[in-house]
Amino acid sequence: FYAFMGLPIALLADRSNRVKIITVCIVLWSVMTALCGVAAGFVTLLLFRVGVAVGEAGCTPPANSLIGDYFIAKKRASALSIYSTGVMLGAVLANLFGGPIAQMQGTDFDAWLKGVGIGWIFSQVDWNLVEGWRIAFVIVGLPGVLVALMVLFTIKEPPRGYSDPPGLVADMPVHWGVAFSELRNKPTFWWMVAGASMVAFVGYGINSFQAPLLQRLHGLNVRDAAVNFGAPFAFMAAIGTFIGGYITEKLTPHWRTAVAWVPALGLLIAAPLYIFAFYSKDLNLVLFFWGTATMCHFSYLGAQYTIGQGVVTNRSRAAAIAVLLIAVSLVGNGLGPYFVGFLSDFFM
C-alpha cells in the first residue's frame, strides 16, 4: 500500500493543492498510528497499518513537488537534503525513545500522567491491562495531528513552476498516462531509479540486521544496540544526507554532474568501511567504521530526489517521485532484508 498508493496521490498532487493533500495524509498517518495502540486483534491492527501506509505514501511526492517550486534548481539539492534529513532525525528519536516507551508498564504511564497533572482525564482506564507497545503507538501518533495543523497554516501553496526559469511551465497532465509518457522518455531518470533501488536494497538489508549482528557478535541487548549504536548511526545518516546535498550544491556551478558523482564517491567510500565494521572485534571500532560508513552511504539521499525533479517538468514532479518510491520500496524494503536473512541462514 505504501508503494502503490503513492501513484494516485502523486497524480492528484500534480493537479491540485499539495499543502492540503499533505495535511490530510499526515492526519490519516497520525490517527491510524495512534489507533494501532487500541487494536483488538490482528485484523484491526492490519487495517490500521494499511491506513498508516496510505498516509505515509501521500507525503513525500507532494512535499518534493513543493520544494521544487519553492527553490531554484541550483538550491534544490541542499533543500531536498534538509527535508530528507528529517527522516534520519526521526530514526534517532525512535532509537532513543521508542524502546524505553515500549518497555513501560501501564501503571508507569499512569504515574507519569498523574505527575504532570492530567491523570484524572484517564481515571476510568485500568492501566494494569495496558501494554507498553500500545502506549508507544498512541504517544507517537497523536502529536502528528499538531504537525498537520502547522503544515496547513504555515506553508503556502506556490504557483506551479514558481522558481523555474520563464518558458519552462508545462501543461497540466490530465491523467497518469501523460505523466508516465514523459518519464518513459527520460533515460536519466530510469538509471537513477535503478541506482537508488540498488542502494536501498543494501541499506534496508544492513539496517534490518544491524541489531541482530550487534547482539550475536558483541553480546548487546536490544536496548543497548538501539541507544548506543542505532541512534548514533541514524544521526550520522542525517549528517551524511545534509552534507551530501550541501557539497553537491557548492560543486554544481563548477561541475555539472556533481549531483551524480558526489553520492557515487560516498558509496564507494562506504563499502570498505562497512566491511571493516562487520569484522571488527572492538566495539569502539565498530562504532567508528559503521558510523562513518553510514554518513558516506546516505550522501545519496538528497541526490536521488534532485535528479528525479531535475529531469521532468514541474507538472510531473510528484509523479516522478512516486515512481521512484515504488521501485525503492519494492526492491529495497521488499527484497533487501529478505536477501540478507537468506544469506544469514545459508552461511550459519
PLM region spans:
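Structural signature of the two symmetry-related core transmembrane helices
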Residues: 20-35, 258-275
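Helix-loop-helix hairpin linking two adjacent transmembrane segments in secondary transporters
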Residues: 83, 87-153, 157
